[in-house]
Every structure is written in structure tokens, then in C-alpha cells.
Amino acid sequence: MAKIIGIDLGTTNSCVSIMEGNTTRVIENSEGARTTPSIVAYQEDGEVLVGASAKRQAVTNPKNTLYAIKRLIGRKFEEKEVQKDIDLMPYTIAKADNGDAWVEVRGKKIAPQQVSADILRKMKKTAEDYLGEPVTEAVITVPAYFNDAQRQATKDAGRIAGLDVKRIINEPTAAALAFGLDKQDKADRKIAVYDLGGGTFDISIIEIADVDGEKQFEVLSTNGDTFLGGEDFDQRIIDYIIAEFKKEQGVDLGKDVLALQRLKEAAEKAKIELSNSAQTDINLPYITADASGPKHLNIKLTRAKLESLVDELVERTIAPCRLAIKDAGISVSDINDVILVGGMTRMPKVQEKVKAFFGKEPRKDVNPDEAVAVGAAIQGQVLSGDRKDVLLLDVTPLSLGIETMGGVMTKMITKNTTIPTKFAQTFSTAEDNQPAVTIKVFQGEREIASGNKLLGEFNLEGIPPAARGTPQIEVSFDIDANGILHVGAKDKGTGKENKITIKANSGLSEDEIQKMVKDAELNAAEDKKKVELAQARNQGEAMVHSVKKSLGEHGASLDAGEKEKIEAAIKDLEEALKGEDKASIEEKTNTLMTASQKLGEKMYADAQAAAGAAGGPGAAAGPEAASAPADDNVVDAEVKEVKKG
């Protein structure tokens, strides 16, 4: 029987795996590598290069070499994330007739599904070369937070590549399969899969249980950001190099497509090197030229500098983790294991942040580049019937419902519901003799339908004349195991029905998803902001009071310059305290803390001298005395943290 292969279709790299008996095998490609760059190049003579060969010629053919195409799949051209990428990518992103984001290569518009299909074709061929037989069936992975449009588009890419996609499976769930299958522990375990890849971020909370000898993998919750990944980290490095080079040479490399492609390659290399070393040299001779001749680029990049450049990106992964824990109805301490997936999790800063949040060391026995493909292969074996001891229970990431009277969103299926699932509810007409009803399908967490994303709509016509509230219209929602939605409406009186499958051209952007969730919990988030601002203001005011008091007592013995610096810092902080900018208050507080260090040293020296004169050890003030808030009239208050949406 032909094998069902497992494919991790990644933003940066892709990987293919199969099951041999009960053992998984990641298959090497024709270049001998276990992962293949998700890069496709279109040559002048019509040849299509995929993987390492496409990557090698990218510098000389930037306009026709496509990478990170997964960031565009199933998205609209007008989406904010797509618009952001237009300025960053050396290739052209174009608007398709249906409003989708496509790419333009050699004067021809191509859908992201077609480009992804070229990558999938390479993975298919890799498996066929190893097995010595044709491969027609596959399980393909997607980020857990991919919406309906993105899942449909991925499935279409598989079909274009000549594959019957037996299942679309979530990447963190696949990684959990790879991790949990060989564990002999019979006790139930709750694991967090933190998946930071090339273009997307997912967090899933999964419970692994042993039920009568069968391993059950149940996803309790999932969250994420489908526009956050290694590509964004690379871009921070590229922006930094461009700024430094402009400062030194007066030339803007951002406008040079060839230079940008070289910078992209160098940034990725530097990022990888800095996971294992404290600094690296970025050396690009002949990067550009002007009237004075060729220009060479040589910049030292330290790990500390890289971490400061990407700190905000790493921090952005924590809010989804908090939400996932909350939605799973557990606390962080209930997590037994933390699994890291995706190449970006090799960065020490990421590992530190994960450890700090979960309070435990992440597991190191899972290969972050291969676990997802391995899990997909295991699921393939389950679907083929060759494996009976695994049960996988995944979830839908957002609530689904219809608009009812008064514009209300009536939720049919709530977020984090285990799939596949079906739900039906009976509705009626709002007016007398109403001949038809329009079923509008929405996705999101807001109570008012218009605040959510309209996925699609259809009519049920031919309703016999009757008083309002009399006709019985049954609306049914059906989410299949791929997370794809089918909606139907049926008049129970006449038996007439109509159905719709949500099409890929009605996708939902990650930005919209996050906005919906955030809007639904807006009040909680606003409260948290107010508390944080109050805390920052209290700390700032205490600092001003403390330093002013110390300055009055010991300022006379300071240099005039030092004293002026402290007074200026006090003035700046007092000005910031009048406003509402928490970051500015914190920054000015830290500036005053630094400026007052000399004052602290002076106080310490004065105290030592006084103690010496008194002939005893004395109780000297520490060097931080000036920086510590005075304890006059300090009231300890317990503030309950409101979880941020």
C-alpha cells in the first residue's frame, strides 16, 4: 500500500518524513540535506529551481526568486501585513483580480498556491526518490492559527502539486505527536508547544493521556501570530545594517535590490552564528558603488546588540502564551513539559524568555526543524489505518457564528472547540410573510456581528408566507478535521436547503483575528494599562522625592556638572510624570537612577567618614540609597493583575 508522507511546508525551510514500521524517517533531498529552503526561482528559459539551487542564485536574480511565500498564502492584497511586505521584499507583490495577494514574476502574475506547489512538488519527488515508487497522498502542516482561507489555500497548493491532501494538521500538534509517541510514561502530561518558525508563531497547550493503551493527544487551547517569525528577526538586522552603512558611507542600501538580497543572506547567517558565539563579522565586499568607486561593508554585530534589536519581537510571543494558558483553564505550574519548535527557538534570548514565562527549562530532546514533519508522518500512518494506538483531538482557533436580529453575533461553535465538530440550531423569520433569509457567517469573538470578520453569506429562498417566528430554519455548522467550515440552512417545513463551503478568497488576516480577540477583552486590557501606568508613575514620583531629599542633604559636596545632570534628570522626569506615556516615565526614571549614582557614592563616603570619626563601624547608606524610593508614607497595596487580551 502506498505511503502517506508527512510534509512540513515552512516559511523558511520545508521537510518531508515517512514512517517505516513504527519508526519515523526524515528523508534527505537530492543535495543530501534533511531540510529544503522554501525558495523558488523562475529562470529566463522557463526552468524552475527549488531549494538550495534557488537560494544560491538569489543574489543575481532577486526579482524572480521567491521566498517566505507562506506569509502571503490565503491573504488579501490590501491587508496591512501584505502591504508591509511589499516594501521589504525584492520581488513584486501584485493584486489579483479577486483581491488576493499574488506575486509577479517575469511579467506574469502567480498565485502563492502555485509557488507553494513547486515546493511541495520538490518534497514529493524527494520522497519518491527514496521510496522508489510514486507518492500521491500527504499530510501537510499549517500554523495552528491559520484561518479558513489559509488552510484552503494550502490544500489547493497540495492539489496543484499532484497530492491528495488527506489531512491539514496544526504544526504544534504535529510536534506534540513526535514528542509524545515514544514516551513510556503512563501518567497524563500537559505540554506547551512553543513554535517560532520563519514566518509564524504558534503556542498550543496539549494534554497527552494514556487511554486503555491508546495515546490520546488533546489540544486544550491554541493561540499565535501568523505574521511573526524569523523573517522579522532578519529584517531587524537588515534595517540596522542599512542604517549603520548610511551613517558611515552616506549610501542607502535599501534602494538597491541586489544589495538587499546579499544583506538578507548575511543577516540570516549572522543571526544563526550569534546563537553560538558572542559576536560575528558581517563582511560584504563591493556591496555597492558611487562616483568615488566601490564600497565595502564590514560591521561587527554582537549577540547583545542583536538581542536589543529583536527584544520586542521576542516579547510579542508572550501575550499569546498567556492567553493560551488562560483559555486552557490551567495555570503555568500545571505544564509538565515545554517543547520548542522552529529554527528561531535556537536563539538563546528566545529560550531565556520561554524559561522565564513557564518557569522551567524547555526540552532539548526534540529537533526543532524536523519534529513537525515527523508528526505529520505519524498522522499519515494513523489515517492509512496502519496505526491504531493514537487519537488526535485538535481545536478551532476562533469562534464561528451567524448574524441574528439586532446585528447580534450568535456563536454556533466557540473557539478552542475540538474538531471535527457539528452544531445545528433552529432560527425563524423576523417579519411576517418573509420569503427568504440571508445567512451571514462570521468568525471572531465580538458580541456584535459587524465587529467580526464576515466569512461568507448565502440565501435560503422560497419560504412559504407565514407570521413572523413561525417558519423553522435549521442552520448547521460543520468543521471538518482540516479546520475547514461548511454551513447549511434548511427550511424544516418545505425541506428546502442551501449550503456553502467558505472559500479561500474570504480569508481572515491575523491582524483581524488579534483585533477581534483584543476588542472582546478590551476592558480588561485597558484596566491593566491603567494599573501599569499608575505603578510607573508611583515609582517615578518616589524617585523624584528620594533624590531631591538626598540632593538637599549631600548635594553641596558634588561637582557642579554632576549636580546639574541630576537636576536636569529630575526636571525631565517631572515633565514626563505630567503625561500618560508609561514608556517615557520608565525611561526618565531609569535616567534619573543612573544620574544619581554619584550622589549615592557621595552619601556612602560621607557615612563612612562619619562612622570613622565616631570611632565605630556606623550604619552606612548603600550606594543605591539615592536611587531607592524614600519609604516616607509608603503604603503597600496588592494590585490584582488583569490578564491582557
Swiss-Prot record:
| Induction profile | By stress conditions e.g. heat shock.
Q: Does the keyword Transmembrane helix apply?
A: no
Q: Give the residue ranges for region: Disordered.
A: 608-645
Its domain of life reads Bacteria
PROSITE patterns given for it? HSP70_1 (PS00297), HSP70_2 (PS00329), HSP70_3 (PS01036)
Name one molecular function that GO assigns to this entry. Answer: unfolded protein binding
- Key words of the record: ATP-binding, Chaperone, Nucleotide-binding, Phosphoprotein, Stress response
Q: Where is the composition biased (Low complexity)?
A: 620-632
The record's listing under Pfam families reads: HSP70 (PF00012)
Which residues are annotated with the PTM Phosphothreonine?
Answer: T200
Q: State its role.
A: Acts as a chaperone.
List the NCBIfam families. Answer: PRK00290.1, PRK05183.1, prok_dnaK
The record, for PANTHER family, names: HEAT SHOCK PROTEIN 70KDA
Q: Member of which family?
A: Belongs to the heat shock protein 70 family.
Q: What is this protein called?
A: Chaperone protein DnaK
Species of origin: Variovorax paradoxus (strain S110)
- Corresponding gene? dnaK
